[in-house]
From Swiss-Prot:
Binding site for ATP: 9, 57, 85, 91, 102, 112
Organism: Trichodesmium erythraeum (strain IMS101)
Keywords on record: ATP-binding, Cytoplasm, Kinase, Magnesium, Metal-binding, Nucleotide metabolism, Nucleotide-binding, Phosphoprotein, Transferase
GO BP, sorted A to Z: CTP biosynthetic process; GTP biosynthetic process; UTP biosynthetic process
Subunit structure: Homotetramer.
Pfam family, one: NDK
Gene that this polypeptide is encoded by: ndk
Compartments reported by the entry: Cytoplasm
Cofactor(s) for this UniProt protein: Mg(2+)
Protein name: Nucleoside diphosphate kinase
Listed CDD domains: NDPk_I (cd04413)
Top-rank taxon: Bacteria
One annotated Gene Ontology cellular component of this protein: cytoplasm
GO molecular function, one term: ATP binding
Amino acid sequence: MERTFIAIKPDGVQRGLVGQIISRFETKGFTLVGLKIMTVTKELAEKHYDVHKERPFFSSLIEFIKSGPLVAMVWEGEGVVASARKIIGATNPLTAEPGTIRGDYGISLGRNLIHGSDAIETAQTEINLWFKEEELVSWKPTLTSWIVE
């Protein structure tokens, strides 16, 4: 079954949006298989955002992601990577569609609440970076048969 990595960034945690964000994925029918609240080390932040290391905003991004608690999650379900991206919305909250997490709750590009893997391959890399295998729990909700044929 397809999996994706989702992180509620420190601004989402500080604003009390964790429950509402999790609810978006649950009501869509995805299964939460990994969840932890944590403070992010500089090493982990730099590995996660390695793709941006040459960008001018890299150091401020690292400082921001370390600035407070973050909720790291792994969600499972059919088409979860692409669907999660739609649920999250455009990177810039000012251009994100209403009805998306960023469109409804986001205020600025630098504080866009949430991260979601952008591809199946990226999801696997990010899951392996943020979670140990024993931290993930595979299970099948009884409602799955009502969601997926």
